[in-house]
Amino acid sequence: TPTYEPTIDDYRRRKKDEIARHDSSDEVNAFYMQGQRMWVDKATRAGLMLRLQAEQSMGKETTTLWYGSHQFELPMANAFQMLYVLELYASQCYDNTQRHLAAVDALESKEEIEAYDYRSGYPEELEF
C-alpha cells in the first residue's frame, strides 16, 4: 500500500494551527504589572473599561484592579492609560498573526511552509 504523502494544503493547515496556538499562548498574551506576569482577555478588558467609566462618572479618583489574589490600586488616569495601551498591544498582536496567516497562504512549496517563522514581528511584552 502506498504511504500517504501530505499535500501542500495539509502543510498549510498544520502551519496555521501552529500560528493559532502561538497566538493564543502566553508567549504573545502576557504583560507585566508591578512585576506580576498576567493577561486579561478581550471580554475582561471591555468589562474593566466599563467599570472604570462607571467609577469615574461617580467621581472616584482611584480604582482597585484584581488579578487572582493580587490587588492593584491605581489612579483612574493610569488605569485608563494601561487599558488603552493593552488594547493597542492586543490589536498589534492580532494584526501580526493575520499577516502570518496570509503569508502562509501565499507560500508555494511545502518546504517554504515548513520553514516559515511565525514568531517574528510581535511587539515586546508590556511592563506597567
What is the meaning of each model-derived region?
Residues 1-128:
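A preference for well-ordered globular domain cores
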